[in-house]
């Protein structure tokens, strides 16, 4: 594997949620800036598929991590099996494939995020051989923010439901 190639497998657990609830958010990337705001700064739809399947939907992303750099990339839905799997082909500042897999557990939802990417920003390519541990830490930070964002989101929903 080249120094600028990465494989990240991240597990999340969202307690008290159903697969359908989590799917509603993770399959709608335009919602990411509301619950994953520290990482997803902007998401816009570039193309909707004509057949309504979701395959071929193209979105433009502006993201960042804890480190002081931003990533601009396009994600195209390559495969989708509602409500348990969505696969995104990424291109731009990084290229590769990301797959979200959801499974219902007794007390919540397990989410596996599997990213296989090549980062093409000049400084990542130039300094990857010494910076890879820091880039991996940055990815873990971003993923932890996403898990926390979903947990907080569903916690708020429960509070609203309890008060109604």
What does each model-identified segment do?
Residues 1-51, 164:
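Hydrophobic ligand-binding cavity/cleft-lining segments
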Residues 26-29, 143, 147:
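Short amphipathic alpha-helical/adjacent loop interface patches that line ligand
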């Amino acid at each position: 594997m080249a120094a600028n190639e990465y494989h990240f497998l991240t597990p999340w657990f969202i307690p008290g949620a159903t697969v359908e609830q989590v799917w509603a958010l993770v399959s709608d990337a335009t919602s990411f800036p509301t619950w994953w705001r520290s990482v997803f700064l902007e998401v816009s739809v570039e193309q909707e598929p004509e057949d309504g399947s979701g395959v071929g939907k193209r979105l433009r992303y502006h993201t960042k991590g804890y480190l002081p750099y931003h990533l601009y990339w396009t994600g195209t839905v390559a495969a989708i099996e509602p409500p348990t799997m969505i696969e995104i082909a990424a291109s731009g500042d990084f290229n590769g494939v990301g797959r979200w897999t959801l499974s219902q557990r007794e007390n919540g939802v397990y989410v596996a995020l599997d990213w296989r990417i090549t980062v093409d920003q000049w400084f990542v390519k130039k300094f990857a051989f010494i910076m890879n541990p820091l880039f991996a830490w940055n990815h873990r930070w971003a993923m932890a923010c996403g898990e926390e964002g979903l947990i907080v989101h569903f916690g708020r929903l429960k509070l609203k439901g309890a008060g109604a």
